[in-house]
Amino acid sequence: MIILGIDPALGSLGWAVVAKETAQLKYLASGIIRTNSKDAIHHRLAFINSTLEKVILEYQPNMVAIEETFVNTNSVTSLKLGYARGAIMSLIGRYNLDMREFKPNTVKKTVTGYGHAEKDQMLHMIKLLLSGTALITNSDEADAVAIAYTCLVTKNY
């Protein structure tokens, strides 16, 4: 089972690929997709879409796990995040992949044991739980690993 975890965002989207081979979890890859805030939104969404498509084609995930989003007090920010999620979900649908959504607190509790863990705690635990993640320093990337990890350990596939 190969899971593509996504921490959705318009400016700095985290992605990670984690596999389950028999009883062992294996970190395969991760990264950040950054878009330029000066670019038109449709160009930013197209860039996210095309970059994630390359990840899907390279790693052939069985499923995508994505973080659920909360409605921000800033409606413009929430709307832009909704655009990014829509572009991602359209791509997931185009490749006929299954998708699971996880609340941020569920991911934090699964990884750290505490549903309100800070970003540095998440990063620390990801490095302990999955070998190969020692070089990850970006919290968006670590969150994507945590989302994929949560999908696999909760057997939500």
UniProtKB/Swiss-Prot annotation:
Q: Subcellular localization, per the record?
A: Cytoplasm
- Describe how the cofactor binds: Binds 2 Mg(2+) ion per subunit.
Q: So what EC number does this one have?
A: 3.1.21.10
Q: Does the keyword Nucleotide-binding apply?
A: no
One example of the protein's molecular function in GO is: magnesium ion binding
Briefly, what is this protein's role?
The RuvA-RuvB-RuvC complex processes Holliday junction (HJ) DNA during genetic recombination and DNA repair. Endonuclease that resolves HJ intermediates. Cleaves cruciform DNA by making single-stranded nicks across the HJ at symmetrical positions within the homologous arms, yielding a 5'-phosphate and a 3'-hydroxyl group; requires a central core of homology in the junction. The consensus cleavage sequence is 5'-(A/T)TT(C/G)-3'. Cleavage occurs on the 3'-side of the TT dinucleotide at the point of strand exchange.
Q: Which NCBIfam families does this UniProt record tie to the protein?
A: ruvC
- Record's protein name: Crossover junction endodeoxyribonuclease RuvC
What is the organism field in this record? Rickettsia conorii (strain ATCC VR-613 / Malish 7)
Q: Which gene name does the record give?
A: ruvC
